């Protein structure tokens, strides 16, 4: 992923958590704050295993986001996997995450400044 698409900095993370909206699914939680540019961060805690496993989850979630980000509203995204993600096969949760982005895209519209859908 290009460096310019990464969400970085404690200040930006705090703003997204405090002022942003939340969309929850069975396997991920996505925080969103409308902004003029599109940036993303995937936060995977240590409870998901060693660094190799966490980085794999991070890469797969980023891949799902990259496949759909052109159709999502501009803003800051923080993607957090839920622990239920570990209890199912990879293809199941990947399809559910992609489905979440498609439903979010449909609910918000491409140029919508804010998404209020809760899935």
UniProtKB/Swiss-Prot annotation:
Keywords: Endonuclease, Hydrolase, Nuclease, RNA-binding, tRNA processing. Its EC number is 3.1.26.5. It comes from the Bacteria. It catalyses: Endonucleolytic cleavage of RNA, removing 5'-extranucleotides from tRNA precursor. Transmembrane segments: none annotated. Pfam families: Ribonuclease_P. GO terms for biological process: tRNA 5'-leader removal. InterPro entries: Ribosomal_Su5_D2-typ_SF (IPR020568), Ribsml_uS5_D2-typ_fold_subgr (IPR014721), RNase_P (IPR000100). One of its GO terms (molecular function) is tRNA binding. GO terms for cellular component: ribonuclease P complex. PANTHER family: RIBONUCLEASE P PROTEIN COMPONENT. Consists of a catalytic RNA component (M1 or rnpB) and a protein subunit. RNaseP catalyzes the removal of the 5'-leader sequence from pre-tRNA to produce the mature 5'-terminus. It can also cleave other RNA substrates such as 4.5S RNA. The protein component plays an auxiliary but essential role in vivo by binding to the 5'-leader sequence and broadening the substrate specificity of the ribozyme. Belongs to the RnpA family. This is Ribonuclease P protein component. The lineage of its organism: Bacteria, Pseudomonadati, Coprothermobacterota, Coprothermobacteria, Coprothermobacterales.
């Amino acid at each position: 992923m290009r460096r310019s698409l990464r969400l970085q900095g404690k200040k930006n993370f705090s703003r997204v958590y405090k002022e942003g909206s939340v969309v929850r699914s069975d396997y991920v939680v996505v925080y969103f704050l409308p902004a003029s540019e599109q940036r993303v961060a995937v936060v995977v805690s240590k409870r998901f295993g060693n660094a190799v496993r966490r980085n794999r989850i991070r890469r797969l979630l980023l891949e799902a986001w990259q496949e759909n980000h052109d159709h999502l509203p501009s803003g800051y995204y923080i993607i957090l996997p839920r622990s239920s993600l570990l209890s199912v096969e990879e293809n199941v949760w990947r399809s559910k995450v992609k489905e979440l982005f498609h439903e979010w895209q449909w609910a918000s519209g491409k140029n919508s400044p804010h998404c209020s859908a809760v899935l």
